[in-house]
């Protein structure tokens, strides 16, 4: 069983050269193979994605992960048109896991990229973007992963970044057949969605907090954002967002982790400006330590919300490679947990 421990990056023991390479490197072909995929969600929405495999998966089945993107209009690679930089966090994670011997399936969220686009009518938009739909999409992606012959059906996991980690926590117990065995929660909040949203706005725009409280209260009570919100808040609370936020605010990530039987790795950046250590993540660390299933938590110093090294307090950490401490911990923990 994977032991429970919390690792701070300053005290991290780096893996040896033998641990850091795949057991098949030197025997099988290096490199990767990529395959486009399309699969149907529960409501018939078509989701488009990419299956990335180690080259040796032609000869040897490999463990696999579903990668789940964070909030907003984020595509399969972890890029968001609202951010003026290529982030590529999910693409980089997929490539690092392929080097370590894992296949990955990452997909464009509904309404994004090559997946089915948002309908035009408000009622249809509310149904299309409801919380349960996004949870179901994780379930559908895991089922799609298992359809590919290169993947070991008994050695799969779910990895979610930011809000994607909440969706992983919500989806995992709803997968009744060929269940995933582990999950990785990267930069995932440990508090309910409404609390995190309040904290973020309190830090970034404290003058808007009254409007945030009014919006969250209206959505909680009647499922719709109120009229007359300040212009600055309207992008956060579009007319269709009520059903999504109702579901998200009712979900307690720490409680979900506390009852999960899956091995779990928590990965966080010490310089995360969105999900701030330790306050925003401590409930997950506490839940991890108080349950019977195995797991580890890592908070890497000088690492951003997007798992990149930062150069200083004003660096958002959008660009560049994955922080080495994060990439190495992900690879070594996943190999130990799933046997790659």
Model-derived regions, located:
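N-terminal secretory signal peptides and thylakoid transit peptides that target proteins
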Residues: 1-12
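Short, surface-exposed "cap/lid" segments of acyl-processing enzymes
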Residues: 58-60, 65-96
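Primarily recognizes the serine-hydrolase "nucleophile elbow" in alpha/beta-hydrolase
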Residues: 144-148, 154-200
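Accessory cap/linker subdomain of secreted extracellular hydrolases
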Residues: 176, 182-259
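N-terminal cap/lid segment of alpha/beta-hydrolase-fold proteins
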Residues: 23-57
């Amino acid at each position: 069983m994977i032991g429970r421990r919390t690792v701070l990056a300053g005290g991290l023991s780096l893996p040896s050269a033998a641990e850091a390479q795949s057991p098949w490197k030197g025997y099988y072909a290096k490199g990767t193979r990529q395959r486009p995929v399309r699969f149907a969600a529960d409501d018939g929405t078509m989701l488009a994605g990419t299956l990335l495999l180690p080259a040796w998966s032609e000869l040897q089945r490999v463990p696999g992960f579903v990668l789940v993107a964070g909030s907003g209009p984020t595509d399969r690679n972890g890029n968001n048109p609202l951010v003026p930089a290529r982030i590529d966090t999910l693409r980089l994670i997929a490539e690092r896991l392929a080097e370590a011997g894992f296949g990955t399936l990452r997909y464009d969220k509904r309404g994004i990229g090559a997946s089915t686009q948002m309908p035009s009518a408000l009622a249809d938009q509310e149904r299309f973007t409801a919380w349960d739909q996004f949870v179901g999409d994780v379930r559908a992606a895991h089922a799609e992963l298992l359809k590919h012959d290169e993947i070991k059906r008994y050695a799969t996991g779910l990895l979610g970044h930011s809000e994607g980690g909440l969706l992983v926590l919500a989806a995992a117990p709803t997968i009744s057949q060929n269940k995933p065995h582990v999950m990785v929660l990267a930069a995932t909040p440990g508090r309910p969605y409404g609390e995190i949203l309040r904290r973020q706005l309190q830090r970034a725009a404290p003058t808007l907090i009254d409007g945030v409280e009014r919006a969250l209260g209206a959505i909680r009570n009647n499922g719709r954002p109120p009229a007359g919100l300040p212009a600055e808040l309207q992008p956060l609370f579009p007319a269709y967002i009520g059903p999504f936020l109702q579901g998200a605010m009712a979900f307690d990530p720490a409680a979900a982790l506390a009852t999960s039987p899956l091995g779990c790795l928590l990965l966080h950046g010490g310089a995360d400006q969105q999900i701030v250590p330790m306050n925003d993540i401590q409930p997950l660390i506490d839940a991890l330590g108080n349950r019977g299933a195995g797991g580890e938590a890592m908070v890497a110093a000088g690492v951003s919300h997007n798992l990149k090294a930062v150069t200083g307090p004003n660096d958002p950490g959008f660009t560049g490679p994955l922080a080495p401490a994060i990439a190495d911990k992900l690879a070594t923990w996943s190999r130990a947990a799933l046997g790659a």
